Amino acid sequence: MSETLLDVKGMNCPLPVLRANKALRALKPGERLRVLATDRAAVGDFKAFCQETGHALVAASEEAGVFSFVIRKRETPQ
């Protein structure tokens, strides 16, 4: 499965979500975006973003202060 990497480490809210939204617009339905972020607020922000937009948050983890989120683009336009 295709996965695009978006590194937004060092950026604070709302920039990680805004950059992810822009990157998702360039993807085809079903493709995945992996976002790397260091802003602790990103955990709640990406969960809310996916619920609001219909994209699927398929994975979320944290290692050494870096949060990783895998988002699958929704299949149909909202």
Question: What residues fall within each predicted segment?
Answer:
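Amphipathic, hydrophobic secondary-structure cores in small proteins
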Residues: 8-60
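Right-handed parallel beta-helix/beta-solenoid
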Residues: 1-7
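Core SAM-dependent methyltransferase catalytic element
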Residues: 68-78
